[in-house]
Amino acid sequence: MKSQTFFLLFLVVLLLAISQSEAFIGAIANLLSKIFGKRSMRDMDTMKYLYDPSLSAADLKTLQKLMENY
């Protein structure tokens, strides 16, 4: 009976360790996809698409300041 209890406890701890490591690996994969994903790379170029010939350099500078924390 003691060996069965020990075996059950061991399996529960093993399953907990596997699920925790899976969540950790998933979080790392999610972070990497956010950093290197296509959407993230496109979002870094937002100022490139704001170019309008009628805007002055001061206007662009003001827009960049406004978009810094967006």
From Swiss-Prot:
Residues 40-70 form a propeptide. Residues 1-23 form the signal peptide. GO terms for biological process: defense response to bacterium; regulation of defense response to virus. The modification Phenylalanine amide is found at residue 36. Expressed by the venom gland. Belongs to the non-disulfide-bridged peptide (NDBP) superfamily. Short antimicrobial peptide (group 4) family. Antimicrobial peptide with potent activity against bacteria. Has strong antibacterial activity against Gram-positive bacteria S.aureus, M.luteus, B.subtilis, and Gram-negative bacteria E.coli, P.aeruginosa and N.gonorrhoeae. Also shows low activity against HIV-1 PV. This is Peptide BmKn2.
